[in-house]
Amino acid sequence: QLVDERIVGNKPSNLSYGEAAAFRLTTLTAWELLFDRLQVSKDDDSKSILIIGAAGGVGSIMVQLAKQLTKLNIIGTASREETTSWLQDLGVYTVLNHKHKLSEELEKHNLPAPDYVVSLNGTEHHIDEIVKLIKPQGKFGFIDDPKSLDVMPFKSKAVSTHFEFMFTRSMFQTEDMIEQHHILNKVSDLIDNTIAF
């Protein structure tokens, strides 16, 4: 089967073919949300990101990309001891328990309002807390499919809202479709040199 070269990249040398095939979806989703949608700066060390559902596939990649390529203060959520340990091993500075109110968890850890909030699952469940805790003029991104999502409460804080769907470029043959090729090659180099999978 032929595949458009604009949506493929080099295989990381230290991954099997199966592992390399599996990392594409999570990697593109994490990268595009972090750098294309939220436009996270790679140089700003005064900002923080809260990643809800950080221990899953996309979250684990996003944490590592943020750790390797930005100076963000990375805050993640988990609820089990093993996922909390996993996130700490990946480099998350503070792990919040997403079974509790996230705004109260931030206060408990004396953390300021995050500039960026990413919801990888349970967005419908967490939306009220996200509205409450995000920094004014912050950026909110998500990947799941809530049945309904009222974003009007973000208006008073002028929070921008961003969807991420890694198939958008290929489905609509966007002008920047080649970016996925470049992203996958960059991440392949990172995996070979720094990121642990």
Residue ranges and their predicted role:
Residues 27-31, 127, 184-185:
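A general structural signal for well-ordered alpha-helical segments in protein cores
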